Amino acid sequence: MKNDFVTKLNPIKNVVFDLGGVLIAWKPDEIIASVFDDSDLQTLIKREIFQHPDWLEMDKGHLEEIDAIQRFYGRTGVPLTKLEELMQFVKESLTPIPESIELLEELAAQGFNLYCLSNMPVCRFAHIQPLHKFWHHFKGIIISGEIKMLKPDREIFEHLLSEFQLQASATVFVDDIPINVEGAKEAGLHAVLFRDADDCRRQLQSIFDSQQIVPDSEI
């Protein structure tokens, strides 16, 4: 059931969403299993690719995908064609989560200023951007690979606030990674750890209620 967020006396005006794991699907284990059948190889791929620091270097825009694939090959010995297939499947797997898009639309309809802040390489965002239609809800989008900054570092949250002239106390950040949520809080933003759309809706409403301004007539 759709929730009518109270906004008239709510000082929070801005909601910032992560992409992977929040608005779009991000399931590395399923991605790996879709390309590789062998369980030992799946473990190797997860450790040496998805959990390796090179993955964050791609997100930060310091490592191009074509160069990363060469590094993956050097660590795993998996044929380059198979690694290219894996990286293409990564892009194709980034599909919208319907319940999350519904929440995004609810917030947009009620007048919240919506923004996007995501750790993602430029090439991956360039792939998904023309495929989906929810981007118009955002007043601004920041992709880590474009600005060479990365969550949960404080500088990326400060860049967000500065770039769009947002007040931290009037802004809520939504992310599925605990350290990113903590990073946002340390930068002065309100923050929600995303589990699913319904839980996120409840957490947002709780924050809105806690920040509610009481009119003088009700004091």
What does each of the following model-derived ranges do?
Residues 2-51, 186-187:
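Active-site neighborhood of HAD-like aspartate-dependent phosphohydrolases
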Residues 2-15, 121-122, 126-219:
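Asp-based, Mg2+/Mn2+-dependent phosphohydrolase catalytic module
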Residues 18-21, 61, 116, 141, ...:
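Generic structural signal for small/hydrophobic residues in well-ordered secondary structure
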Residues 30-31, 53, 67, 71, ...:
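Alpha-helical elements of Rossmann-like donor-binding domains used by nucleotide-donor carbohydrate transfer enzymes
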Residues 38-48, 77-88, 212-218:
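Short, surface-exposed acidic
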Residues 55-86:
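A metal-dependent, Asp-based hydrolase signature
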Residues 66, 84-115, 126, 154:
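Short, acidic loop-to-helix structural element flanking the phosphoryl-transfer center
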